[in-house]
């Protein structure tokens, strides 16, 4: 997840991409058109442009059976994935302490608040103490819950936002990830103030505010995501209808890839929360009772909202179109800002096609369950460029801290879509140009600079291909 400062060019530039560190990258004239982004014309901001580049845009890359096998392999081989069904009925203190301690480590470097002021040591000490490590019991019963509202996952049980420098206000170091309505969790520990739970979800273990989780029996919790018939959200976001009768499911946001069961036997003509259902799908959502227990309530998902009664087929067309549904969305580190970061972005795209991925770039990049090309310092610039020019739609390109998804090639130049804080490239005057995109962005790959001496291609660490 790279960081850049802003600088926008309004006139064409010739970019020097034949860096001394990358002799294999042939010199090429790059212009900065009226988009202000290197090599990107207005037409290339339309998914139809990239779909039109494909000779077989509707070719099925992996069918339903192959995707199921891929997901099974992920759960079996990838240690970052948690199998909630395999958890024992009681948990040892060692197991729970291991989860919490791995994440909630006392900060050792200065941190700053939203106003750029240093966070006091006693304030940080109170945050660490609220993790309540000494209270972890041995043999506690494993409890399960469903998330009832999009919610943050945090490194500590606090809403305090902290930053590594006094001029950074976006990368909250206590923000880890996010969960969506219907996501299952195992509840394994409670904060000292009683307002937070430490939960284990299939892809991440972290702190979540209690008010976003409803606790129920394992069968109902773990079976919720397997119920049929169902709807899958295929837009960036979908919303249930407003209802004053049941505020818990009113205008509830459902993000791309969220799967919710349909109440197919709902009687025709019977109102749902005071409204006829013929213009909507009647879905069922988890809700939290006042005592924190799990219940379910019907809700209306309008036909106008983007959803399907099946996962989308894994095709080049769908990969491109799903990625572009986020185009321009504000970058949100760890799913903050009601958005997502680079790894969350690619995860949601693939989730809408039924494909599961690890949460973070560090785990995605090396997952043994995927079709991986590993790169090292021993790989020459020529080999790196060759690999880049062989990339296909949907391939995931990893550099330290960042991931991009390939959307096509133009004259041997790979283009990517990615959720990034900014882009850097070299101008005709030899100076670095920085564009603070701070959102989902389209760009060519090879002219992007990682630092003053290396390009993104130089720093590629892994390619992951969700294909045969």
Predicted regions and their residues:
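Second-shell loop/turn segments in exported
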Residues: 169-172, 244-247, 305-310, 328-337, ...
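Loop/turn positions that initiate beta-strands
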Residues: 180-185, 255-263, 393-397
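Gram-negative bacterial Sec-dependent N-terminal signal peptides
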Residues: 6-24
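Aromatic- and glycine-rich peptidoglycan recognition patches
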Residues: 28-40, 47, 203, 211-232, ...
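Active-site nucleophilic cysteine motif
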Residues: 333-353, 357-364
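Soluble non-cytosolic domains of exported or imported proteins
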Residues: 144-147, 173-179, 248-251, 310-317, ...
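...with weaker cross-activation on analogous glycine-rich loops/strands in unrelated enzymes
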Residues: 178, 358-427
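Boundary regions of SH3-family modules and the immediately adjacent low-complexity/disordered segments
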Residues: 27-154, 160-164, 170, 186, ...
């Amino acid at each position: 997840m790279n960081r850049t400062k802003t600088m926008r060019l309004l006139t064409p530039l010739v970019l020097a991409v034949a860096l001394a560190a990358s002799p294999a990258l042939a010199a090429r004239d790059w212009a900065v058109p009226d988009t202000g982004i290197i090599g990107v014309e207005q037409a290339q901001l339309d998914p139809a442009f990239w779909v039109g580049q494909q000779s077989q845009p509707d070719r099925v890359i992996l069918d339903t059976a192959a995707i199921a096998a891929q997901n099974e392999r992920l759960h079996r081989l990838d240690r970052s994935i948690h199998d909630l069904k395999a958890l024992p009925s009681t948990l040892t203190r060692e197991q729970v302490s291991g989860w919490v301690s791995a994440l909630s480590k006392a900060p050792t470097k200065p941190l700053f608040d939203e106003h750029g002021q240093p966070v006091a040591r006693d304030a940080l000490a109170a945050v660490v103490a609220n993790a309540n490590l000494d209270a972890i019991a041995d043999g506690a019963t494993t409890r399960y819950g469903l998330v009832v509202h999009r919610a943050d996952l945090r490194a500590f049980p606090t809403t305090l936002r902290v930053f590594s420098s006094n001029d950074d206000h976006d990368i909250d170091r206590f923000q880890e990830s996010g969960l969506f309505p219907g996501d299952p969790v195992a509840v394994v520990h409670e904060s000292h103030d009683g307002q937070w739970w430490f939960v284990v979800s299939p892809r991440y273990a972290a702190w979540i505010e209690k008010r976003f989780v409803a606790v129920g029996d394992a069968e109902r919790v773990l079976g919720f995501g397997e119920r049929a018939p169902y709807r899958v959200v295929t837009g960036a976001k979908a919303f249930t209808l407003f209802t004053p009768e049941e505020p818990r499911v009113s205008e509830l946001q459902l993000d791309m890839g969220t799967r919710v069961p349909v109440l197919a036997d709902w009687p025709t003509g019977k109102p749902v929360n005071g409204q006829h259902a013929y213009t909507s799908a009647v879905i069922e959502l988890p809700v939290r009772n006042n005592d924190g227990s799990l219940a379910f309530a019907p809700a209306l998902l309008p036909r106008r909202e983007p959803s399907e009664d099946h996962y989308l087929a894994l095709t080049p067309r769908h990969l491109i179109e799903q990625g572009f549904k986020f185009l321009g969305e504000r970058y949100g580190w760890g799913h903050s800002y009601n958005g997502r970061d680079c790894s969350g972005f690619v995860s949601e795209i693939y989730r809408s096609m039924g494909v599961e991925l690890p949460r973070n770039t560090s785990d995605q990049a090396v997952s043994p369950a995927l079709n991986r090309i590993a790169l090292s310092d021993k790989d020459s610039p020529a080999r790196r460029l060759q690999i880049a020019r062989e990339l296909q739609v949907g391939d995931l390109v990893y550099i330290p801290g960042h991931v991009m998804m390939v959307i096509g090639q133009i004259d041997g130049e790979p283009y990517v879509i990615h959720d990034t804080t900014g882009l850097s490239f070299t101008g005709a005057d030899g100076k670095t140009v920085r564009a603070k995109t701070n959102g989902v962005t389209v760009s060519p790959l090879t002219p992007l600079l990682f630092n003053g001496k290396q390009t993104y291609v130089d720093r590629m660490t892994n390619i992951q291909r969700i294909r045969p």
